[in-house]
Amino acid sequence: MLKIGIVGGTGYTGVELLRILSQHPEVNIEAITSRKEAGMDVAQLFPSLRGRIELKFSDPAEANLEKCDVVFFATPNGIAMKQVPSLLDAGVRIIDLAADFRIKDIAVWEKWYGMPHACPELVAEAVYGLPEINRDRIKTARLIANPGCYPTAVQLGFLPLVESGAADLDHLVADAKSGVSGAGRNAEIHTLFAEAADNFKAYGVSGHRHLPEIRQGLSQAAKHPVGLTFVPHLTPMIRGIHATLYVKLLKEVDLQALYENRYVNEPFVDVLPAGSHPETRSVRGSNLCRIAVHRPQGGDTAVILSVTDNLVKGAAGQAVQNMNLMFGLPETLAITHLPLFP
């Protein structure tokens, strides 16, 4: 049994990790940390886990994380990078669900995240945890940078066309919408029910932290720098991401065949029949990314629709998928939950 530690177990990604890992047959959760809730039963804070998780939250200073096989960081940006070096030295493998190790250019990371990086020497080693492009590297990694929620949906939607050479790489457009859980569990005015319900708005139009992450991944896939306009939106739903992606085609291509062939062996990417319109509720609670491709009026613009659950494939589910790969377990183990409906 793998010994698991979770740093930051009280947010939405933390409780989603607990939900998934509590049903995983090959793991034992050793520690769940929270300074604020130290000493409290996990099931008291999260009644949904009653009968599944019998642990108490522990203070990070008292948790014996060095005895774990793998530690998940479900913490705000800037926390993991301060603790990861000592854990790696102790032989612990790391999966960071925050952004500390995603962006390879340290200056770019520091610009977007507004703080100096505490361990820049480890960034080059970190493997970007998108299995659909880095599966082999993930298997041997010590340190995984779990992708962001928007970057997962957007990159999986763009990848086949970007890799094919059939796309105008200078003018990619990603119009993405997220549920309010993507903003985290802290109390903020814009996510209050009275503010978010019956409302819809764009944000971060001049620049969002996920922009350099998406651009980095697509540029690596294309082996060429890409130009990307990324506009996120906040929608009045709890969980889910819907990305509408626009690509100008440079040559004739069978879009349906291209996407089906690219993802035929991917257990968590579902390419829908031609003309489909995926809905966020079709992936709610699952580790799936569902994609549909369109070519309006047979013109030179492809429209790709990509939907995920931001807390599962966009966070905790993908983290467990990476853990399975790292430890030689079946990739789909404990993350084949069917979507919730209605």
Swiss-Prot record:
Query: Which molecular-function annotation in GO is an example for this chain?
Result: NAD binding
Recorded metabolic or biological pathway in which this protein acts: Amino-acid biosynthesis; L-arginine biosynthesis; N(2)-acetyl-L-ornithine from L-glutamate: step 3/4
* Residues annotated as catalytic: C149
Write down the superkingdom of origin.
Answer: Bacteria
Entry GO terms, CC: cytoplasm
**One Pfam family matching this protein:** Semialdhyde_dh
Root EC class: oxidoreductase
Q: What is its main location?
A: cytoplasm
Q: Which compartments does it reside in?
A: Cytoplasm
What EC number(s) does the entry state? 1.2.1.38
The record's InterPro entries line, in alphabetical order, gives: AGPR_AS, AGPR_type-1, NAD(P)-bd_dom_sf, NAGSA_dehydrogenase, Semialdehyde_DH_NAD-bd
For this chain's UniProt record, which GO biological process terms are given? L-arginine biosynthetic process
Which keywords belong to this entry?
Answer: Amino-acid biosynthesis, Arginine biosynthesis, Cytoplasm, NADP, Oxidoreductase
Catalyzed reaction equations: N-acetyl-L-glutamate 5-semialdehyde + phosphate + NADP(+) = N-acetyl-L-glutamyl 5-phosphate + NADPH + H(+)
Role according to the record: Catalyzes the NADPH-dependent reduction of N-acetyl-5-glutamyl phosphate to yield N-acetyl-L-glutamate 5-semialdehyde.
The record's family statement is: Belongs to the NAGSA dehydrogenase family. Type 1 subfamily.
PANTHER family registered for this protein in UniProt:
N-ACETYL-GAMMA-GLUTAMYL-PHOSPHATE REDUCTASE, CHLOROPLASTIC-RELATED (PTHR32338:SF10), N-ACETYL-GAMMA-GLUTAMYL-PHOSPHATE REDUCTASE, CHLOROPLASTIC-RELATED-RELATED (PTHR32338)
Q: Which NCBIfam families match?
A: argC (TIGR01850)
Under which name does UniProt file this protein?
A: N-acetyl-gamma-glutamyl-phosphate reductase
